């Protein structure tokens, strides 16, 4: 779970920016996107193969 504790003189904008960065690094939104609909085993294999190709390229 992502939490952001505000400092004494910290503004909402900077706290929101930190929160968005932490959510992005944790991969929470990507996880929500994948779990929005049921993913069949074939789709899962395809997604993992594409990710492996992308990882191998870099």
From Swiss-Prot:
In Gene Ontology terms, what is one molecular function of this protein? structural constituent of ribosome
User: Pfam families from the xrefs?
Assistant: Ribosomal_S21
Is the keyword Nuclease assigned to this protein? no
Q: Which domain of life is it from?
A: Bacteria
Keyword check for Ribosomal protein, yes or no.
Answer: yes
Q: Which UniProt keywords apply?
A: Ribonucleoprotein, Ribosomal protein
Gene Ontology CC entries for this record: ribonucleoprotein complex; ribosome
Output the InterPro entries linked to this UniProt entry. Ribosomal_bS21, Ribosomal_bS21_CS, Ribosomal_bS21_sf
Q: For this chain's UniProt record, which GO biological process terms are given?
A: translation
> PANTHER family annotated for this entry?
MITOCHONDRIAL 28S RIBOSOMAL PROTEIN S21, SMALL RIBOSOMAL SUBUNIT PROTEIN BS21M
The family classification in the record reads: Belongs to the bacterial ribosomal protein bS21 family.
State the protein's name. Answer: Small ribosomal subunit protein bS21B
- Which species? Nostoc sp. (strain PCC 7120 / SAG 25.82 / UTEX 2576)
* Gene that encodes the chain: rpsU2
């Amino acid at each position: 779970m992502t939490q952001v504790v505000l400092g004494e003189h910290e503004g909402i904008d900077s706290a929101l920016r930190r929160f968005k960065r932490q959510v992005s690094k944790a991969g929470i939104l990507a996880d929500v996107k994948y779990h929005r609909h049921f993913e069949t085993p074939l789709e899962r294999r395809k997604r993992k193969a594409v990710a492996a190709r992308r990882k191998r390229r870099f």
